[in-house]
């Protein structure tokens, strides 16, 4: 229960989050390897999320969510494209894996920034031979992420790795979380600032896709966060995508 309380409190402070940094995207493609190094800006406010990537100063990719839907603006292709999807549905198969790994829920899960809450499995953490704790939680289900296996450093109670598992218990994606430092958080004194991983390394099980995130001066205060970052209509006016794909078939729900 103490481990749950520590992670849940830490994750709650990250519901407001902003950072600059660098993202490196590597993937094997026919005939060789694709590599992109991008400047990053990330903003999160509750369930709202925005991630901007720039390459050589030009817009490259914008991923965002208003808490109900999420979207990807692909800004360098011909034609430029916007894909809009509901958060409660699986991922389209034509979306590149490196883009789907940067989606709001997946990124927060694999970076160890989500609470355990009631998702923690009842068999609880196990102490492995390497002295680290292992535990499992339910995953979002997106893209086959049915469970998450966490590796926790017990002294500081911080996740150092997260694995996304499919419905057969096979690892789909694995992350390594490194270089923790305390970051400023809203309404928290310096001594209570939460620990945040400065480096998140993500690799899929095939080894064909690799995403490396290097955060620069992250904070949980939210001083630069503005509503327009999460407003899809305003983003469309700004980016003017040449092709728009709405994939909004939703899980049926009972009307209020």
Name what the model sees in each region.
Residues 1-39, 95-98, 126, 244-256:
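N-terminal leader/targeting segments and the immediate start of mature chains
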Residues 23, 53-57, 67, 76-77, ...:
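A mature extracytoplasmic/lumenal domain signature
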Residues 44, 65, 146-164, 214-226:
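A short, surface-exposed beta-strand/turn
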């Amino acid at each position: 229960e103490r481990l749950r309380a520590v992670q849940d409190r830490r994750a709650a402070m990250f519901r407001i989050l902003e950072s600059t940094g660098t993202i490196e995207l590597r993937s094997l493609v026919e005939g060789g390897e694709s590599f992109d190094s991008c400047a990053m800006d990330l903003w999160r406010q509750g369930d709202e999320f925005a991630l901007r990537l720039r390459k050589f100063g030009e817009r490259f990719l914008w991923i965002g969510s208003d808490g109900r839907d999420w979207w990807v603006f692909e800004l360098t292709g011909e034609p430029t494209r916007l894909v809009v999807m509901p958060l409660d549905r699986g991922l389209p198969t034509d979306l590149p894996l490196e883009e789907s790994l940067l989606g709001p829920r997946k990124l927060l899960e694999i970076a160890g920034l989500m609470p355990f809450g009631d998702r923690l499995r009842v068999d609880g953490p196990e102490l492995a031979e390497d002295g680290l704790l292992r535990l499992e939680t339910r995953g979002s289900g997106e893209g086959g992420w049915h469970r998450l296996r966490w590796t926790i450093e017990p002294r500081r109670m911080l996740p150092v790795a997260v694995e996304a598992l499919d419905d057969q218990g096979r690892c789909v994606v694995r992350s390594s979380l490194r270089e923790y430092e305390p970051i400023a958080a809203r309404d928290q004194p310096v001594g209570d600032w939460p620990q945040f991983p400065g480096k998140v390394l993500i690799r899929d099980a095939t080894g064909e896709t690799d995403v490396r995130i290097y955060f620069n001066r992250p904070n949980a205060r939210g001083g630069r966060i503005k509503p327009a970052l999460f407003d899809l209509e305003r983003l469309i006016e700004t980016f003017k995508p040449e092709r728009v794909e709405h994939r909004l078939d939703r899980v049926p729900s009972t009307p209020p």
